Amino acid sequence: MESQIQIKLFATLQPFAPELGEAYPISPGISIRSLLEQLNIPQEKAKLIFIDGIKANLTSTLNGGERVGIFPPVGGG
């Protein structure tokens, strides 16, 4: 059974955004690591990951209905 999440990619990750917009279909139980692979986002480019506003990691799982935000490393000077 397929579910959906709301996904928001920030800054330099925006080119990896799904063509369908923020709503993205997933299989329940998918890990963040697998989601990154589906979106072709290298793991080292996903520095901060939030699920429903709570910091997550690569082994966190999604079941559908969540809001996921992914941020790249921040550089400055």
Regions flagged by a language model, labelled:
Residues 1-76:
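Ubiquitin-like/PB1-type beta-grasp interaction modules and other compact soluble beta-rich domains
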